[in-house]
Regions:
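Active-site phosphate/pyrophosphate-binding segments
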Residues: 1-150
Length: 150
């Protein structure tokens, strides 16, 4: 059995594991798929070559996200649209309704990623902010939620 944990965790010193893969304490859950946590699981499930390709794709996305041209940076464009919808239009929520059962967990995943980061009511210094922050994210596959949400 293997463990993926921080070096300060009791699991790191346990003799119950064949190997321990370490990750820094500051790495949040949204990054765990490309940390040792996800790396071990994805490599065992799909092979190390697939995991290497995932890391390459993540590196390409990082490069894309640094482009200052809004037309060539979909991440920046999406973020600015979100700020506009929330702060100018006043939309309090965002529905995610994928029309594929294969994406049935997408709304929950996006909810965790977005709301964990953007739903704060204080700034990085712990001071209250004087503007609205991220919207409430909710949803279901469109085939289930279409009559409930719209």
């Amino acid at each position: 059995m293997l463990t993926a944990t921080s070096e300060t965790s009791p699991l790191a010193k346990s003799d119950d594991y064949l190997a321990a893969f370490f990750m820094d304490d500051f790495i949040g859950g949204r990054y765990s798929s490309v940390s040792s946590v996800g790396g071990v699981i994805l490599s065992l499930a799909f092979g190390p070559d697939v995991f290497a390709r995932i890391l390459d794709g993540m590196a390409e996305e990082d490069k894309l996200a640094t482009n200052k041209d809004i037309k060539a940076n979909p991440d920046l464009l999406d973020a600015l649209i979100g700020v506009y919808e929330r702060n100018v239009q006043g939309y309090p929520s965002t529905a995610v309704l994928p029309y594929s059962q294969a994406l049935s967990r997408q709304a929950i995943h996006l909810q965790q990623c977005d709301m964990e980061s953007n739903g704060k009511t204080v700034n990085r210094f712990g001071e209250p902010v004087n503007y609205v922050t991220g919207p409430v994210i909710f949803g279901e596959p469109g085939t289930n939620g279409q009559h409930s949400f719209y």
